[in-house]
Amino acid sequence: MSAETWPPRYKLHKYWGRKPANVVARSIEMFTEPGATVLDPFSGSGVTLVEGARLGRRVAGFDLNPFAARLANATLSPPSPADFEAEARRVIAEVRSRTAHLYTTSCDACSKDAVVRSVGYAGDAMIEVRYRCPACKASGAHAPTSRDREIAALRVPVPEGAPDEDILFGWEMQKLKRKGVRRWSDLFTHRNYVTAALLRRAILDVAGGPCREWLLLSLTASLAQLTRMIADFSGDAGGPSWKINCYWLPKSWQELNPVWYFENRVGKSLSAIRDLVAAGAPFAQGGCAVADSRALPLADASVDYVFTDPPYGGEGIQYGELSMLWCLWLAERQDLSAEVAYNPFRKLDHAHYASGLGGVFRECHRVLKPGKWMTVTFANKDPLVWSALMAACEDAGFALVTTAPMRRSAPSLTETNMPAAPKEDMVLVFERPRRSGVAPARGPSD
């Protein structure tokens, strides 16, 4: 199978390791008919659920990560484009009026006030101020002036309720620990932290429902860009974004104007909403629950098909840790101790990972109808991790039927910079054989 580029409906938010929508959709169409029930026990951002619902299937997703569940459910239930655009404009106008003075510089062309778009830094030293002038429409950049430095140093009050807490130093936070970063607010410049918190407060004033949820997720989708984690790349490195799967503070970095980049993100969210609505959303055929898939709340033999992309183990992506900043700003808490992962910094060893996979796939076997199919996508170069996956599926009672490579549309930055990183996923198709009995249900502690 060959992956295609992502359709606009997934532009709402970044999520690590997301599988290509066309591969998921093709698999669902191949193994089910409309009206069938499709399960994803590691549903993540909800691609299986969205593609299944779009194709007229009932969907059931489960994930321990509350951020993932909120993203999946929001994607299934978008607001109307007009309502979202109107509320977004109100939020942006309100916060821009309160923070414009924090992002002002002088235009080199006409000497009038211009809007700071970004500021380049080398360590703590301000190197370059980039701007766009609303008066003469010029875009430019200059070395920082005394005025630029004075504005950047302003200590305006932090809004009440601004999200913050001590950082849990798991695997993906070690670069921060070595830099002496201790609290999440330390990732931001002062003015960016204040502005991001004002955006959040303005969004929370929106009446509850899909508009507010999509605005909140548009903000969390922007959060990394509002921190000091955005490298000041040059050349063909692409736009400013969170490019590597860890928290870090690059030596050369950019301070981006939060309102400017939130407005850009809103445009992407609006594109996603329009694509989803054109595909038939909001969908009412199911959703994602925050639950442990080692104890699925589903009846025996009640599912027609399973499609899932389990956590990779070994040195794979730490989904829970990489969602912690997003969860903080959504006022969500995760139970990281139950995560199916390998993480020596949180004392989750390979046995914990293998046991977790085994418990989930036993439950998949229990709820899948005899003679039906399960598709698993997986990528890892560690034979021990592959052995854990295959043992989990086979010990649960599944029979491997076929495998095929899934070629990606483009390599990630991690794949480009790390020769040992897997270059393609494998697609594995299993069957629950037609036989009497089902795998016994197991609790999360088994």
What is the meaning of each model-derived region?
Residues 1-39, 53-299, 315-346, 360, ...:
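Nucleic-acid modification enzymes, centered on SAM-dependent nucleic-acid methyltransferases
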Residues 34-35, 332, 363, 368-374:
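Short glycine-dipeptide loop
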Residues 42-46:
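Class I SAM-dependent methyltransferase "Motif I" SAM/SAH-binding loop
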Residues 50-51, 392:
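Hydrophobic/aromatic ligand-binding patch that stacks against planar heteroaromatic rings
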Residues 306-307:
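Hydrophobic beta-strand segment of the Class I
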Residues 336-340, 372-378:
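Conserved beta-strand signature within the Rossmann-like core of class I S-adenosyl-L-methionine
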Residues 354-370, 395:
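A short glycine-rich, Lys/Arg-flanked "PGG" loop and its adjoining helix->strand segment in the class I
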